[in-house]
C-alpha cells in the first residue's frame, strides 16, 4: 500500500514505515502529524485517485528530526569586471516516519 500526498508545495510517494524529508514543519521531535492533502492511495490493484484530494484520505507520520541540509554555495560572476559574489545557504528540513495510511 502506498500513497501520494502534498506537503510544502511538493508531492511525496510514501509507504508505511518509510522515512521521508519534508520542508520544515514547526513541530517538536516525537510529535504526530496528519496530512489530509492525499492525492492518491493505492492498495494492490485498488487505486483511489482524488479530484483533487481523496475524500477521507489521511497520512499519519511521526517527526523524527529537525535538521539542516548540507551547505550549498552560490557564486555570481561577471567576466572581465573583477566582480564576484559568493554566498552560502543551508535549508531547514523535517524528517518524518510514516506510521499509517488511511483511506
UniProtKB/Swiss-Prot annotation:
Family as reported in the entry's similarity comment: Belongs to the bacterial ribosomal protein bL21 family.
Gene Ontology molecular functions: rRNA binding; structural constituent of ribosome
Biological function: This protein binds to 23S rRNA in the presence of protein L20.
SUPFAM superfamilies: L21p-like
Intrachain disulfide bonds: none
A biological process term (GO) from this entry: translation
Keyword S-adenosyl-L-methionine in annotation: no
Source taxon at top rank: Bacteria
Annotated keywords: Ribonucleoprotein, Ribosomal protein, RNA-binding, rRNA-binding
Ribosomal protein in keyword set: yes
Subunit structure, as described in the record: Part of the 50S ribosomal subunit. Contacts protein L20.
Name used for this protein in its record: Large ribosomal subunit protein bL21
GO cellular component: cytoplasm; ribonucleoprotein complex; ribosome
InterPro entries: bL21-like (IPR028909), bL21-like_sf (IPR036164), Ribosomal_bL21 (IPR001787), Ribosomal_bL21_CS (IPR018258)
Amino acid at each position: 500500500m502506498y500513497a501520494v500526498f502534498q506537503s510544502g508545495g511538493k508531492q511525496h510517494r510514501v509507504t508505511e514505515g518509510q522515512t521521508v524529508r519534508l520542508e520544515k514543519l514547526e513541530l517538536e521531535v516525537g510529535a504526530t502529524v496528519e496530512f489530509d492533502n492525499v492525492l492518491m492511495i493505492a492498495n494492490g490493484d485498488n487505486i483511489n485517485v482524488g479530484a483533487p484530494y481523496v475524500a477521507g484520505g489521511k497520512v499519519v507520520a511521526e517527526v523524527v528530526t529537525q535538521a539542516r541540509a548540507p551547505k550549498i554555495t552560490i557564486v555570481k560572476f561577471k567576466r572581465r569586471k573583477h566582480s564576484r559574489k559568493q554566498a552560502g545557504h543551508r535549508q531547514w528540513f523535517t524528517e518524518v516516519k510514516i506510521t499509517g495510511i488511511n483511506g
